[in-house]
Structure formats: structure tokens, C-alpha cells
Amino acid sequence: MRAATKIIFFDDKNEKFFGEGPARLLRGIEETGSLRGAAGQMSMAYTKALKLIKNAEAALGFPLTQSTVGGRSGGGSRLTEQGKEWLSRYESYRDACIQANLKLYMEHFPEQR
């Protein structure tokens, strides 16, 4: 037996807009320099990845990514400063919640260690 912690953010209409999927996409953009590359790493369609990012940006009210159009050197995407800050805060909050949940689990179910 185990307990799991899942952090999901909802907007004012109670619509999910940010969780582990969009966070992984943003990390992937940092690693690959493109939304298409990040989506590919996750075996996700580019259109779905774009929709996830756009939904999160609409709910947050600021851009998470900035895209450059192709050309000789090719296009790409990168995180905005606000995007980097949001991702960092999300990951820190998620990790703190996981640790708190683990501690509570051990207190309430000590026989399950």
C-alpha cells in the first residue's frame, strides 16, 4: 500500500490548467529548445502540447514560453522569465507537498513502512 500526491491547479471555472504534464512539457522545452521536441519526448501530439501551454498561459495571465520563427538556424521555444519562475515555484510546492504527505502517511499508517 502507498499514498500518492498529485498537485493540480484549477482556474476560477474549476477547469484544470496546470499539473505534472504541463510541468514536464516546460522542462522539456528547456532541454530541447522547442515545444515540438518536448512533445516528442513525451509521445504527445504537438497540437495537444500547444493547447496545454496556451490553456495554462490563459489561466495564469502571462506567457510561459516565447517562440522564434524558423529560418536558417531554425525556430524554437524557450521559457520566459515568468515561465521559469512559475515552473520553479510549482516544482518546489509539489516537492514540499509530497514530503508532507509522506510524513503524514508514516504517522497515520506506521505499519506500512
Segments (PLM) and residue ranges:
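Short, Lys/Arg-enriched N-terminal segment that forms or immediately precedes the first helix
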Residues: 1-14
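Short helix-boundary/capping micro-motifs
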Residues: 32-40
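Central "turn" residue of the DNA-binding helix-turn-helix
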Residues: 43-44
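Residues within the DNA-recognition helix of helix-turn-helix
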Residues: 52
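Residue cluster at the C-terminal edge of the helix-turn-helix DNA-binding motif
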Residues: 58-63
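Basic, amphipathic "hinge/linker" alpha-helix immediately C-terminal to the N-terminal HTH DNA-binding motif
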Residues: 67-90
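Alpha-helical linker/hinge and terminal dimerization helices associated
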Residues: 89-107
